[in-house]
């Protein structure tokens, strides 16, 4: 009997937080469910978080436990704070999903910080507009309304009609009596649910802690590439993560801004009047017919190569297989193995501007937008920060496009701002997943059936994905060739290099995209780090600078990793600065070809 009493007390104690905070628990659980349902994308394959209901129960229970152990006077204020934070975050999160098709992101929070009072007022007015009230936001607002009415009924019963009061009182008394009689059963159920939810949610809680423990935004991003990364399934988690991500980027931005203020150029000979850098995306070198691939994916570039002014490089690798990591190393004068971090060094466009070049940046990826994923946020924050953007670029495009060819129209509009000495950077969407969306329908050449003999191990869907990828490369071939044509009659040099490679059913693999968490072996490096690279020179350029073109040709078979690209660019600009290193300049006779090419700071490419 004593044991039964002890068990009864334990069960009662377990259920006590929910009993004391019954209204809080019910409404907050309903809020969690409603926001999850309201932010479920209307897309094929979209589904709710698998552990939504159990983990939500655990989270709500923890909040009620906190309220239970607090003194009553303190508890009232803390509970009010919980209500405000959770309801407000839910409204904003669902509103963002309705308006921007994305829940809260670090970029959204960054954009909020840049709004003025007028824009804030417009946002608040839009929240109460009929179209918003009738959207999924309305469900959250309806729950708030019901919650407020129920709270008013308890505190100010005379506001409620007498018949309603009697009905509510009757229901309440019957419910309380039922709960009193069922207390042992309820205690057992709560304990069982609690144990179950802890076991089911432990992995995500550990993963969330790991995500929130990163020391840099790059580390956080890499954590998100892991297969079992944290699921931020509630608005409040997404808000906290967004604040955390912005805090991490702010630290690196501060260092970059300090470095930018100290940038110095010793001299500049303007060796190349027009330098054009084209940065591609997700380009597996072994899918380029220019490098021996079976399918004719690069006919235009091969034609340029046969004309003798396009020089392809045969042994180039990327230091990472993540765009944001590569971009930081491409733009910074830092190279793998240097002391400190990439953000402790100047960005090469800053040096070009300081030297007197007019710098243009035309991107089809890194413009700040509300629904920007953390990957783009991490890769573009140092390009889009107002101070750093002003330090790097004189001219930028202002909108993204569905297809890369529209960047040429952007350049046509901005070309009038060019000066005698120009650095022009094109950043393409290239072969970024989804491959099918990277080329217009009328420009597609390859079909899934074309790969039956080449890839008999693939099914029809996989062969079509492979065809989509090759069609994206073929379309990219036309885009980069059109960019080259823009400078045919100029005194110009054009460099093409993608950020990293890409898996697309290599060998016997049934996989596309990239394996961020896998150990790097020769096969993976072959697919995800081997990239194409070439340099094209106009006739005017070759005629005036035959020695530079000779250097370009002589370097074509050298081993190279693109973290050192900035040093070659400074050489082409004739820029002498403290951070320039001759041994990292691919075109220099002093270039150190034996420098280790370390992939992801872990693996020596040349020892695989």
For every predicted segment, state its role.
Residues 292-296, 497-545, 582, 587, ...:
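Histidine-centered active-site microenvironments of extracellular/periplasmic hydrolases
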Residues 361-363, 423-430, 470, 493-498, ...:
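Short beta-strand segments
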Residues 340-346, 463-476, 518-531, 542-569, ...:
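A short beta-strand-to-alpha-helix junction
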Residues 1-223:
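Transmembrane and membrane-interface helices of multi-pass
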Residues 64, 409-412, 450-496, 520, ...:
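A long, amphipathic alpha-helix that forms part
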Residues 506, 549-562, 574-607:
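Polar, surface-exposed loop/tail segments
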Residues 276, 472-514, 566-570:
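Metal-dependent active-site segment of extracytoplasmic phospho-/sulfohydrolases and closely related
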Residues 190-453, 528-530, 561-592:
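Active-site-proximal alpha/beta segments of enzymes that process anionic O-linked groups
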């Amino acid at each position: 009997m004593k044991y039964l009493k002890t068990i009864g007390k334990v069960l009662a104690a377990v259920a006590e937080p929910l009993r004391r905070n019954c209204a809080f628990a019910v409404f907050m659980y309903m809020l969690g469910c409603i926001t999850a349902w309201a932010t479920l994308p209307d897309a094929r394959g979209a589904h709710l978080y698998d552990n939504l209901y159990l983990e939500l129960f655990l989270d709500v229970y923890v909040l009620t436990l906190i309220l239970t152990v607090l003194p009553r006077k303190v508890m009232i204020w803390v509970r009010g704070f919980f209500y405000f934070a959770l309801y407000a975050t839910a409204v904003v999160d669902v509103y963002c999903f309705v308006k921007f098709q994305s829940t809260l992101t670090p970029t959204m929070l960054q954009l909020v910080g840049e709004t003025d009072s007028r824009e804030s007022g417009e946002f608040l007015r839009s929240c109460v507009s009929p179209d918003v009230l009738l959207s999924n936001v309305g469900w959250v607002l309806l729950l708030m309304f019901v919650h407020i009415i129920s709270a008013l009924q308890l505190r100010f019963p005379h506001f409620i009609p007498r018949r309603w009061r009697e009905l509510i009182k009757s229901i309440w008394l019957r419910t309380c009596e039922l709960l009193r009689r069922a207390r042992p059963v309820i205690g057992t159920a709560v304990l069982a649910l609690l144990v179950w939810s802890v076991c089911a949610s432990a992995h995500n809680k550990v993963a969330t802690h790991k995500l929130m423990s990163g020391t840099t935004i790059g580390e956080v991003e890499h954590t998100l590439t892991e297969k079992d990364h944290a699921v931020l399934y509630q608005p409040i988690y997404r808000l906290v993560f967004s604040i955390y991500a912005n805090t991490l980027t702010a630290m690196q931005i501060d260092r970059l801004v300090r470095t930018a203020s100290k940038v110095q150029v010793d001299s500049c000979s303007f060796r190349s009047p027009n330098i054009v850098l084209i940065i591609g995306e997700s380009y597996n070198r072994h899918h380029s017919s220019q490098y021996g691939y079976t399918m004719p994916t690069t006919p235009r570039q091969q034609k340029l190569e046969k004309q003798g002014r396009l020089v392809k490089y045969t042994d180039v690798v990327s230091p990472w297989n993540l765009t944001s990591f590569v971009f930081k190393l491409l733009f910074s004068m830092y190279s793998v193995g240097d002391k400190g971090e990439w953000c402790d060094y100047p960005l090469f466009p800053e040096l070009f501007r300081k030297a007197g070049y007019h710098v243009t940046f035309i991107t089809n990826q890194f413009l700040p937008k509300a629904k920007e994923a953390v990957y783009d946020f991490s890769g573009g924050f140092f390009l889009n920060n107002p101070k750093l953007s002003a330090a790097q670029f004189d001219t930028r495009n202002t909108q993204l496009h569905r297809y890369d060819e529209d960047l040429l129209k952007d350049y046509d509009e901005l070309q009038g701002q060019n000066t005698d000495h120009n650095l022009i950077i094109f950043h393409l969407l290239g072969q970024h997943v989804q491959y099918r969306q990277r080329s217009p329908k009328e420009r597609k050449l390859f079909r899934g059936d074309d790969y039956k003999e080449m890839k008999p191990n693939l099914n029809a869907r996989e062969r079509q994905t492979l065809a989509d990828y090759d069609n994206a490369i073929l379309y990219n071939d036309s885009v980069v060739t059109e960019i080259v044509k823009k400078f045919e009659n100029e005194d110009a040099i054009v460099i093409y290099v993608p950020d990293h490679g890409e898996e697309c059913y290599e060998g016997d693999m049934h996989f596309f995209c990239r394996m961020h968490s896998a150990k790097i072996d020769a096969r993976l490096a072959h697919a995800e780090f081997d990239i194409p690279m070439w340099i094209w020179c106009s006739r005017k350029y070759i005629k005036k600078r035959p020695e530079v073109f000779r250097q370009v040709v002589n370097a074509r078979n050298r081993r190279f990793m693109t973290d050192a690209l900035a040093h070659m660019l400074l050489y082409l600009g004739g820029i002498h600065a403290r951070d320039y290193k001759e041994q990292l300049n691919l075109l220099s006779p002093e270039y150190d070809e034996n420098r280790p090419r370390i992939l992801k700071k872990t693996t020596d490419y040349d020892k695989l």
